[in-house]
Amino acid sequence: MIKIYNTLTREKEVFTPIEARKVRMYVCGPTVYNYIHIGNARSAIAFDTIRRYFEYRGYEVNYVSNFTDVDDKIIKAAKELKITAPEVAERFIKAFEEDTQALNVQPATLHPRVMDHMPDILAFIEVLIEKGFAYEVAGDVYYRTRKFPNYGKLSHQSIDELEVGASQRTGVEQQLKEDPLDFALWKSAKEDEISWDSPWGKGRPGWHIECSVMATKHLEETIDIHGGGQDLEFPHHENEIAQSEAKTGHTFANYWMHNGYVTIGEDDEKMSKSLGNFITVHEMIQKVDPQILRFFMSTTQYRRPIRYSESTLKEAAANYQKLKNAFENLRFRQADAVASLPEDEHYLAQLNELEQRFITEMDDDFNAANGITVVYELAKMMNQYSEQATVSEPVLVAMDKLFSGWLAIFGLFFKNEELVDAQVDALIEERNQARKDRDFARSDEIRDLLKEQGIVLEDTPQGTRWRRSE
């Protein structure tokens, strides 16, 4: 059974879906005003892996992740780029899709956009006003934080603790509020800013209301899982709970999941645009195979921080190559496999035992770090089996299926390089013939040519194998 660490309770809990074998999951998506950096990509990759594991375990996942296409940062970017806010959003939604596709992140079941939900947002706010949870002042609408009795339950903060911080804020907005703790649901329009008509005058929605509206519209009033980065726990997710539960009277999400940061530098600073210590995915995938970056990001337990450095990335690349070599060794032996061998049942039983161990590790709050350790064990077993003089098709097929299935959970695959492979095979065949003809000069020439292309040859009793160098 799958256990999830629930931020709400600070405990691991057995996952019990609202509807049997189905998962309703909402994850906060990007604010689309720039290219995403690898810290942003952590969330997309973490929840893609979680989604894939649910599917591996037989669940049907309805996965909704939004695009925030209305925001102060987008308005600022529009002014700097001298284009409209919708044009900024469209440009960077496309960039996000290209970057995540390169990282083999599956598109969500639905990617709703704020601009497409204005009538829903207005209706949601009106209900909160009618219930006394919100009020209008000077064209702005604010949420009455103290009216929601359980405010602070997600971040485990009391109203008194929050009040100390809020009382130190200044500005016109603070003067308009009934209480420093109140937060904006609707912001009145400023000159030359994108805006929409509302019962309170022209304006645009606050950040927190958007996710409450889109989650409850597309996944019902109560959802199984709400996820996002740790930095969203407060105030964003806390405010989502207050808004949603005040409107519906029901629990908003049963499980709250938060992924860890990507850190960088000797002080392990959180990677962020505000600190200027970030590397965009767009830049990174020009230098590094996106699959290696995906591997680097996928194989740490999602709640743990990932320390980015040249050395940790190189280590990931080396481990990825070891898995690829094991896969290529296995595929190499398929051509000469026999129909069956007496020891087949022994190997198939070992594979079944490995699969159960993998499931046990991943069922424990999607512990990818422990899960990938089992993948390494399978790779070692594959290498040892491939070295045998005689191998059987049933064992090769079972190993291939298990290995490929596990890699898919982590969003990994080995690129189809059939044309290149065919060229390599042709050169190896020519080299073999040259050796038979005792034309060692040509044999060495072919070996050197392949080496220059990153192809390493290994002459074995079963024939010449090749692999791409690390």
Curated annotation (Swiss-Prot):
Gene encoding the protein: cysS
Residue span of motif 'HIGH' region: 30-40
Needed cofactors: Zn(2+)
Assembly and oligomerization: Monomer.
Organism encoding this protein: Enterococcus faecalis (strain ATCC 700802 / V583)
Chain residues that bind ATP: K273
GO biological process, one term: cysteinyl-tRNA aminoacylation
Subcellular location: Cytoplasm
Motif ('KMSKS' region): 270-274
Gene Ontology, cellular component aspect: cytosol
The entry's keywords: Aminoacyl-tRNA synthetase, ATP-binding, Cytoplasm, Ligase, Metal-binding, Nucleotide-binding, Protein biosynthesis, Zinc
Protein origin, superkingdom: Bacteria
The enzyme's E.C. designation: 6.1.1.16
Substrates-to-products reaction catalysed: tRNA(Cys) + L-cysteine + ATP = L-cysteinyl-tRNA(Cys) + AMP + diphosphate
Keyword NAD: no
Family label: Belongs to the class-I aminoacyl-tRNA synthetase family.
Manner of cofactor binding, per the entry note: Binds 1 zinc ion per subunit.
Residues that, per the record, bind Zn(2+): C28, C211, H236, E240
Listed InterPro entries: Cys-tRNA-ligase, Cys-tRNA-synt_Ia_DALR, Cys-tRNA/MSH_ligase, CysS_C, Rossmann-like_a/b/a_fold, tRNA-synt_1_cat_dom, tRNAsynth_Ia_anticodon-bd
Molecular function terms from GO: ATP binding; cysteine-tRNA ligase activity; zinc ion binding
Coiled coil: none
SMART domains for the chain: DALR_2 (SM00840)
UniProt name for this protein: Cysteine--tRNA ligase
